[in-house]
């Protein structure tokens, strides 16, 4: 009897299980979509991250800078010996170089001084470039010399070459810039060797383009070499588009590595604005323009 009762109870239980399987949610039904752990953990993209990490940590950066400055050092004796040698583009050379004292023109930021810490702060704050915060960094006078720059310019100065630092830092930042350069060991005998944006110069208009300041140097000096991380450090850019930049450089390609020496800067520059135009674009608009400029060779 107990066995019969047990069998009956078991049969009802099995029927109940079958009923549940039929009328309930099938165990094999696909679960609701969920966010994968990888997607949950993915950090927000930052256009500056890879470039800044490379600039601060990659040995290759220092090797490139040192290569450029050593190549310039090898060309310097010939440039000094040839009294007709001049590195100013034709639109900036307003007179004869005969009898002029020798000089070298260098940009400051990311050419002789390393400002990557200011970009690190920008990344950690989740912020875009800000002139006020940039001014704070400049006032701290903490920028370090880039590889090879100090040795080359110091040696050039010992050979009687005046170094002019033509920078697009604001003229109000001249004192901090001079102090930073001197504390880093660069040859700055006179404050007049630092020509910031807005410096009062007679005879030419002052703007972000450096042509006016190059002309001013050229009045009294024969410019042996120019150094920079932007095309505008060498020649005036009439049309800041990728094609416009190539066009303005085309007549001077033979000077590259001989009179003009370019340094790498993946952090910022007119190369970036050339992709999207004015600086009033939002970060999203700038990223869209950058992605559109990419070529996957398909």
Features from the language model and the residues they span:
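Structural recognition of the beta-strand scaffold that forms the well-ordered cores
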Residues: 103-107, 113-115, 162-167, 193-196, ...
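Non-catalytic pre-domain segments flanking phosphatase-related domains
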Residues: 17-106, 277-298
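Substrate-recognition element of Asp-dependent hydrolases with the DxDx(T/V) motif
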Residues: 110, 149-181, 193-195, 231
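Bacterial N-terminal signal peptides
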Residues: 5-16
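C-terminal cap/substrate-recognition subdomain and adjoining C-terminal extension
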Residues: 174-298
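Active-site neighborhood of HAD-like aspartate-dependent phosphohydrolases
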Residues: 101-103, 112-147, 151, 158
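Second-shell loop/turn segments in exported
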Residues: 54-63, 135-142, 164-170, 201-204
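Extracytoplasmic/secreted proteins, especially bacterial periplasmic and envelope-associated proteins
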Residues: 67, 71, 136, 144, ...
